[in-house]
A protein has these predicted regions:
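Accessory nucleic acid-recognition modules appended to NTPase machines
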Residues: 1-128, 132-135
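Residues at the C-termini of beta-strands that transition into short coil/loop
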Residues: 49, 73-75, 121, 144, ...
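Short acidic, glycine/proline-enriched helix-loop-strand junctions
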Residues: 118, 176-202
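A structural signal for isolated positions on well-ordered beta-strands in alpha/beta enzyme cores
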Residues: 118, 139, 166-167
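Conserved acidic residues
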Residues: 129, 138, 163
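An exposure/low-complexity boundary signal
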Residues: 131, 202-203
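Active-site ExK catalytic segment of metal-dependent nucleases
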Residues: 136-148
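Catalytic cores of nucleic-acid endonucleases
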Residues: 145-187
């Protein structure tokens, strides 16, 4: 129970990685292994594993100890954070958790289409929220609550080949062939997730 109640706090850290010490001082990840497994099987939480630098397929976690937990119900995220759900959309500038809220939303939509969750971290602060494998091709997903920059995608491309990247944000649908970047609004992610799952993804 204490694990479940602290998930949004885990995501609100700078690294977002699961940190057992945040729940109980001196505790280890293995102390929560059974709880995480049970909550994942019950679809109460969704587990995303870290990938580093150069990625090989099929996608496999670089380490079982580096992962993140997302809440399986986006409404529960709002409840745990104590922030009105409407503020995540209407007043996002004043809501420091809005970026995490949207990441949690995308994670749930990917899980709904039976994708396994992975995220990428470079040696610096570079990070991409989700990496999807479809038809032996990589599709990095960058989740932005605003316009944001593409620094992480540029660093990712230095180490990995990908079909094209997908930026999920509030912006309108569009495609930049030079950057191989498809931009989609948040409401479109269920359709993209399905196409990736079916292996029918096209621009």
């Amino acid at each position: 129970r204490v694990l479940f109640q602290n998930i949004y706090r885990e995501l609100n850290k700078e690294s977002k990685n699961f940190s057992p010490g945040l729940i109980e001082e001196k505790s280890k990840t293995r102390d929560y292994a059974t709880s995480i497994q049970w909550l994942t099987m019950a679809h109460v939480v969704n587990q995303s594993f870290q990938l580093k630098e150069h990625i090989t397929m099929p996608l496999m976690p670089d380490s079982e100890s580096n992962f993140r937990l997302f809440l399986g119900d986006i409404g529960m995220f709002s409840y745990q954070s104590g922030i009105n759900a409407a503020s995540f959309v209407s007043n996002e500038r004043d809501n420091t958790l809005s970026g995490i809220f949207f990441e949690n939303f995308v994670a749930n939509e990917l899980i709904a289409k039976e994708h396994k969750l992975f995220y990428w971290r470079g040696r610096t602060s570079a990070e991409l929220e989700f990496i999807i494998e479809s038809n032996n091709k990589l599709y990095p997903l960058d989740v932005k609550k605003g316009r944001g920059t593409l620094n992480s995608l540029e660093k990712f491309s230095n180490h990995n080949k990908f079909e094209y990247a997908i930026k999920v944000s509030k912006n309108n649908y569009g495609y930049n062939p030079e950057q191989r970047l498809l931009t989609i609004p948040f409401y479109f992610i269920p359709f993209i997730a399905k196409d990736l799952a079916d292996g029918t993804m096209t621009i």
